[in-house]
Amino acid sequence: MTIRNQRLSLLKQPISSTLNQHLIDYPTPSNLSYWWGFGSLAGICLVIQIVTGVFLAMHYTPHVDLAFNSVEHVMRDVEGGWLLRYMHANGASMFLIVVHLHIFRGLYHASYSSPREFVRCLGVVIFLLMIVTAFTGYVPPWGQMSFWGATVITSLASAIPVVGDTIVTWLWGGFSVDNATLNRFFSLHHLLPFILVGASLLHLAALHQYGSNNPLGVHSEMDQISFYPYFYVKDLVGWVAFAIFFSIWIFYAPNVLGHPDNYIPANPMPTPPHIVPEWYFLPIHAILRSIPDKSGGVAAIAPVFICLLALPFFKSMYVRSSSFRPIHQGIFWLLLADRLLLGWIGCQPVEAPFVTIGQIPPFVFFLFFAITPIPGRVGRGIPNSYTDETDQ
């Protein structure tokens, strides 16, 4: 058998042909911009988190008396341990930044619209899994903020009628955050990334069923090129830029995105003066505390994800991309500003005037999803595909 025939035979194997179909010969719109590179970048972030997490787990001890010291052991005694920890800790923030940009790009260009509803729903599930994974990963360092963050967040389940207290006891594995809680969170944090991998593969498969959206928001099977080598090279530019950005945080500001109280061993006796979650939880924290009643605040979190899930089913857009919808553009930038304001409010102390100001951004956030279908019905716009007009 010649070398050429051997290569062809290899590509015909089930696994190789699947990889070739989805990663090499996948037909891609030729006008994709750099904003479409955040999907592959998110995959790289996930791989970084899994690899660094596995190596960190080799040196970590999930016990309340040893957890904090084992983290310090990684930092001081393990060769390259400081790099592993800073890559993992800052990598979580980089992962969330990339995914946020990926989500907002989809909102701007309406990538969630028909026939890609299932792609969007899977994306929301992935986002929810990421939040749970990040929260379970915040507890294992067993610093002061880790302990009290776990105590406060898990206590929110007590707002659920009838079964709330039972759920809290089950989460804790006892009557307070202790060794059982630490072991449960560490185990879940080790498991969830692999579930994320499976959900991401389903997300990719669902996307490739109908193909990628593009900046124009129209579909054409004529103006497409293979993913390799064109978009590999284009994505490579984004990967290099991300590597530089990531390296700056690792080597020059590794602790900026963390909290100094987490360098104090967990102590259930003194309460920190201001319990602040990680930056990626701040918008949810702001929505939670915008309603004075505990049950109302917890109930306000669920609609955030329900709105994101329901958005693809608003059958109202003749024009998909916001490039041709100036009204929707304004609403989108208002949502982005509101998201930043939620993050700022979430890190402020619970006192005037922040409490009053904090009740406005959640209202604007939910208003966005309520009025999104309206601008989509203004104007006929461009056809859904280049061939629509010729087929009529």
UniProtKB/Swiss-Prot annotation:
One Pfam family this sequence matches: Cytochrom_B_C
Main location: mitochondrion
UniProt: a ubiquinone binding residues: 208
UniProt record, GO biological process: mitochondrial electron transport, ubiquinol to cytochrome c
Gene Ontology MF terms: metal ion binding; ubiquinol-cytochrome-c reductase activity
Domain of life, source organism: Eukaryota
Cofactor note: Binds 2 heme b groups non-covalently.
Miscellaneous: Heme 1 (or BL or b562) is low-potential and absorbs at about 562 nm, and heme 2 (or BH or b566) is high-potential and absorbs at about 566 nm.
UniProt protein name: Cytochrome b
Signal peptide start-end: none
Binding residues annotated for heme b b566, in chain numbering: 102, 203
Family: Belongs to the cytochrome b family.
Record's keyword terms, sorted: Electron transport, Heme, Iron, Membrane, Metal-binding, Mitochondrion, Mitochondrion inner membrane, Respiratory chain, Transmembrane, Transmembrane helix, Transport, Ubiquinone
Gene3D superfamilies the UniProt entry points to: Cytochrome Bc1 Complex, Chain C
UniProt: heme b b562 binding residues: 88, 189
Membrane topology, record value: Multi-pass membrane protein
Cofactor(s) of this protein: heme b
PANTHER family in UniProt: CYTOCHROME B (PTHR19271:SF16)
Cell compartment(s), UniProt: Mitochondrion inner membrane
GO cellular component annotations of the record: mitochondrial inner membrane; respiratory chain complex III
Subunit structure: The main subunits of complex b-c1 are: cytochrome b, cytochrome c1 and the Rieske protein.
Function according to Swiss-Prot or TrEMBL: Component of the ubiquinol-cytochrome c reductase complex (complex III or cytochrome b-c1 complex) that is part of the mitochondrial respiratory chain. The b-c1 complex mediates electron transfer from ubiquinol to cytochrome c. Contributes to the generation of a proton gradient across the mitochondrial membrane that is then used for ATP synthesis.
Transmembrane stretches, start-end: 38-58, 82-104, 119-139, 185-205, 231-251, 295-315, 327-347, 354-373
